[in-house]
Structure formats: structure tokens, C-alpha cells
Regions:
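Adenine-nucleotide phosphate-binding core of ATP-dependent small-molecule kinases
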Residues: 176-181, 274-315
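Residue-level signature of catalytic and energy-coupling elements of molecular machines
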Residues: 10, 19, 77, 173, ...
């Protein structure tokens, strides 16, 4: 009996590394193993310590191997959308065979021709996704193999990223003893599971509240049109709690998960919990509403930053609405807070598969789902047709347009990739700026309560 095709997704996140193992059984993905390990080798989505990242990858893979009872050798790796560019590309060749029948070799050659374009030396091609083939002027062809023709043309989407970042990811995966089967841009992976086909077609905003950064993406006509990365995420919420309550990061994370609300309207001011305060023998009592206001302040800042970027491309004019996922979105009230700030009805996505019922698994799950749905022609173009003999869904289930849509280059924050902001010299200054704001309401209350607690 032939074993079903196995897919392994690797999500190297700022706060954790996650692995999902899935099998394609009767054109359905079955999750057979998962792994999760705390990550200490990344900062704001950037690998800063290769050895620690390798250790986290090995641990997560080992967990997934034990649960799935298989040996993992090859993984599909998610790539964050920091400084990712998606551009249309075009290639044309003469069909090589004497009988003019288009073969796998011709598909590979026309893709190579599409790659022949000026790519800056600091960037690297991550993948090229075929969208439409043209044979002797006849367009709209999804798979030209077996057809007779003289001229073969290809319209495709070329995805490029910073060479240094891609190299660091490759280095970590290879040092962990694994082979990279393919790369998948994380917003595309998230969209594969978090959005319906209609939502991807009509136009929908997808927000991923990660640990080290938050990403707002726009999917339209089945393609990624726009992506913006804010270098703040759930980890910054934890740091705020740690700084303001004068407690350790581990305590702050535990407090956030056990007592935290993303909206102060949902929390109760008469519910108290103990906080182990640095420099004091006895725990300090803090009410849930105060904690919620600390969390809400940071999430509000993240949402407002994402809104400014989305307003620039008029993303809110699209009819698909807003979908929110990612680890930080699991805090009660995160969706309602987004609705009030962004002015759109929002839907919360969490994987429904057993073992994955946490939004922090969305990307890893999306990676395997995206890879499984790629048509066979994609793998042929990459020269890997023998590795994927049974695609999860037939090619006609994929949505293609007769011409590749014009891609809007992803927009990014003014900060350089992996660089500290020049506006503030340290994280503490940012927190002080939040606390010392001249605005009334929450900020004034924070100042007053801090004085009461620590004076």
C-alpha cells in the first residue's frame, strides 16, 4: 500500500517554533503530529542567534516525530513578509522537442526564462508561481503539457526577499539536519486556512497578531496584494506588563494568559490577583481592569499603526471584511477592540483540527495546507515533479485569472529589517512615553495607580 503524501510545515516565530505534520488521505489533510518549542533566537521576526534557533527547531521537530511516529527529513518553511516583494514576471521559449509536444522540460525552461530579470544583489528569489501559460497565442492555459506548439509563454508571480534573511533561515534549517522542500510566504499560508475562497477572491484584510510582530495583509483576486509589518506583537504586551507591574517577564506572560483581557470593558475592577513584585517580599494585588488597560494600550497602538497602512491602499473599501488570527488574538476582547479601532466587522480564526486549536498554530497549519493545494504544474516548474505525484486537489480547483493582476508592492514600516528604531534608544523609553502621555483617561489612571502601588 502506498503511503499518503506527507507534508511538514515549519513556522519559525519570534516567541515559538512550531511544526505541523499532515498526511493527504483521500484529498483531505489529516494532522498526525505537532511540535512547539519556545524560541529565544529571534527578535521581532529576525534570527539573531543561529544556535538557539537551531536548538528550538530540533526540539519542535523531535516532538512532532514522536507524535506522528515518522522520521522528518524535509520541511516546508514559512517566510515572514518583512521586505517581501511580489512582482509579475514573464518568460517565453521555443518548444524544444522535434514533435513540438510540450513536456516537463519545456515547463522548467520557460520558468527559468521568467527568472531572467534584474534582481538586486541583496535580494533572492524565494519562488516563482505560474499563473497562466500561452501556447502559440492561445492564453488562459493552466497546464500546457501534452499540447502541441511552437512558442510557449508564461505569466507568473515572482516572490523575492532579503538575501541575508533567507540565508539565515536556510542555515538554521540545514544545521538542524533538515532539507528545505519549499518556502511559503506566511500571509499566503495564513490566508489558505483562515480565509474562504470567496474571501480571497472578493478582497479581505487578514491580520496576524504574532508574538514579535503584527502583520496586516490584503488578499484580492486570489492573490496577495499588500502586506505591512508592524514590529510589535504579543511579546510587547508582556514587556509592558513586566515594566509597569515591576515583575519578571515569565510572571508577566503568565499573568497575561491567566488574567488578561484585550479590552478594559470586559474586565472587572473588583477582581484581584497577586503579582510577585521585584524588590518586595509580599505580592502586590492588582485588579483585572487595570491589567486590561495596560494590554489595551499596546494593542490599540498596534491596530492604529496597521490602520494607517491599510488606509493608504484603501483596503477598507474591499467587501470581504476583516479576519484576525495569531497568538495574541486569543486574548478576550482582541476582536472587539479591532472592530472599534478599524471600523470593520471582524471574524476570529482558530484552527479547528484536534491538537491545533490555538491561533498560534495558524501559520504552521496554513503552510501544509497551502503546499498540499499547489497544483502539480508548480512542482514541475520547480523541477520537483517526481516529489509530488498526488496533489491534494486537482488543478481545476485552483483559481486563476487570464492575466496576472498588477501586484502592489508590499509596504513596510520606516524601520529597517531587524534594526532598532532611531526614534527611541530603548524599549523602556517607549513604555515611558506611553505612561507619560498628556492624554487623559487610561494614561492618567496608570500614572496614579503606579504612584499608589510603588510609593
Amino acid at each position: 500500500m502506498v503511503r499518503p503524501k506527507t507534508y511538514v510545515g515549519l513556522d519559525i516565530g519570534t516567541t515559538s517554533v512550531k511544526v505541523v505534520v499532515a498526511e493527504n488521505v483521500n484529498q483531505r489533510l489529516n494532522i498526525i503530529g505537532v511540535g512547539s518549542q519556545r524560541s529565544e533566537g529571534l527578535s521581532r521576526g529576525v534570527i539573531v542567534d543561529i544556535d538557539k534557533t537551531v536548538e528550538a527547531i530540533r526540539s519542535a521537530v523531535s516532538q512532532a516525530e514522536q507524535k506522528s511516529n515518522i522520521k522528518i527529513n524535509e520541511v516546508i518553511v514559512g517566510v515572514p513578509s518583512n521586505q517581501i516583494n511580489i512582482e509579475p514576471c514573464y518568460g517565453m521559449i521555443a518548444v524544444s522537442g522535434e514533435n513540438r509536444e510540450i513536456t516537463d522540460k519545456d515547463i522548467h525552461n520557460v520558468l527559468s526564462a521568467a527568472k531572467v530579470r534584474a534582481v538586486p544583489p541583496e535580494r533572492e528569489i524565494i519562488s516563482v508561481v505560474p499563473e497562466e501559460f500561452i501556447v502559440d497565442g492561445f492564453d488562459g492555459i493552466r497546464d500546457p503539457r501534452g499540447m502541441i506548439g511552437v512558442r510557449l509563454e508564461l505569466y507568473a508571480s515572482m516572490i523575492t526577499g532579503p538575501k541575508t534573511i533567507i540565508h539565515n533561515i536556510k542555515r538554521c534549517v540545514e544545521k538542524a539536519g533538515l532539507v528545505i522542500g519549499d518556502f511559503v510566504v506566511q500571509p499566503l499560508a495564513n490566508a489558505e486556512v483562515a480565509l474562504s475562497e470567496d474571501e480571497r477572491d472578493f478582497g479581505t484584510i487578514l491580520i496576524d497578531l504574532g508574538g514579535g510582530q503584527s502583520t496586516a495583509s490584503v488578499l484580492h483576486e486570489g492573490q496577495l496584494k499588500f502586506s505591512y509589518v508592524d514590529q510589535e506583537g504579543g511579546e510587547y504586551v508582556t514587556k509592558d506588563i513586566s515594566t509597569i507591574l515591576n515583575t519578571t517577564l515569565d510572571n508577566a506572560e503568565r499573568i497575561k494568559l491567566e488574567y488578561g483581557y484585550a479590552s478594559s470593558k470586559k474586565a472587572r475592577p473588583d477582581e484581584y490577583f497577586p503579582v510577585e513584585t521585584i524588590g518586595k517580599k509580599e505580592p502586590t494585588k492588582v485588579d483585572e481592569q487595570y491589567l486590561a488597560e495596560i494590554i489595551e494600550a499596546r494593542l490599540q497602538q498596534i491596530y492604529e499603526t496597521l490602520k494607517k497602512a491599510l488606509d493608504q491602499v484603501e483596503a477598507f473599501d474591499l467587501p470581504g471584511g476583516l479576519v484576525i488570527t495569531g497568538g495574541a488574538s486569543s486574548l478576550p476582547g482582541a476582536v472587539e477592540l479591532a472592530e472599534s479601532i478599524l471600523g470593520e466587522e471582524a471574524r476570529f480564526y482558530i484552527p479547528e483540527e484536534v491538537g491545533l486549536r490555538n491561533p498560534s498554530y495558524t501559520t504552521a497549519y496554513g503552510i501544509v495546507a497551502y503546499a498540499a493545494k499547489l497544483p502539480d504544474i508548480y512542482h514541475v516548474a520547480q523541477g520537483r515533479s517526481k516529489q509530488v505525484k498526488q496533489p491534494l486537489h486537482p488543478t481545476e480547483n485552483r483559481s486563476y485569472e487570464p492575466k496576472p493582476a498588477d501586484h502592489v508592492a508590499p509596504s513596510y514600516s520606516e524601520e529597517g529589517y531587524g534594526q532598532e528604531s532611531t526614534k527611541e534608544n530603548s524599549y523602556e523609553k517607549k513604555v515611558k512615553q506611553l505612561i507619560s502621555s498628556e492624554d487623559g483617561g487610561f494614561m492618567q489612571k496608570v500614572r496614579n495607580i503606579i504612584d499608589d502601588i510603588f510609593n
